[in-house]
Amino acid sequence: MPRKGSVPKRDVLPDPIHNSKLVTKLINKIMLDGKRGTAQRILYSAFDIVQERSGRDAIEVFEEAINNIMPVLEVKARRVGGSNYQVPVEVRPERRTTLGLRWLVNYSRLRGEKTMEERLANEILDAANNTGGAVKKREDTHKMAEANKAFAHYRW
């Protein structure tokens, strides 16, 4: 906790091509070592691949994919009487989008395709069709929350 009050929340600027803050956040997640130009090139190439393969607008497919990835529930560890319980809690909207983007990028990086553009495009298409690693992660998170429903009364 900072001594001098809370730190102000910084807002991201919408990206110049699609005018979307969500796209900017995804670029920031893809970016490594401050190389924003490389991250933008990867994302826009991936969007071109998505549009080509799906025949729909890439932003629509991307937003559908993110909605399929974002978790509603997660578990948090809570210590009660000397033992740790996995307590299911609802995920705040800001954290939902952050987790969705993080999982999308992480599971894209784990894929087997040759270039990052192809990996990201295929993960977005898979997520839009409710398949793929990122959607599986969301399902696993929900299963954990469901399995620990008995400890829901420990919520704080």
From Swiss-Prot:
The record's GO molecular-function terms, alphabetically, read: rRNA binding; structural constituent of ribosome; tRNA binding
Similarity section: Belongs to the universal ribosomal protein uS7 family.
* Keyword tRNA-binding applies: yes
Instruction: Name the gene behind this protein.
Output: rpsG
Q: Which UniProt keywords apply?
A: Ribonucleoprotein, Ribosomal protein, RNA-binding, rRNA-binding, tRNA-binding
Show the HAMAP family listed in the entry: Ribosomal_uS7_B
Q: Which Gene3D superfamilies match?
A: Ribosomal protein S7 domain
Role description: One of the primary rRNA binding proteins, it binds directly to 16S rRNA where it nucleates assembly of the head domain of the 30S subunit. Is located at the subunit interface close to the decoding center, probably blocks exit of the E-site tRNA.
Protein name (database record): Small ribosomal subunit protein uS7
Which species is this record about?
Staphylococcus carnosus (strain TM300)
One annotated GO biological process: translation
Pfam short name (any one): Ribosomal_S7
How would you summarize the oligomeric state and partners of this protein? Part of the 30S ribosomal subunit. Contacts proteins S9 and S11.
What domain of life is recorded for the organism? Bacteria
Q: Tell me which GO cellular component terms the UniProt record holds.
A: small ribosomal subunit
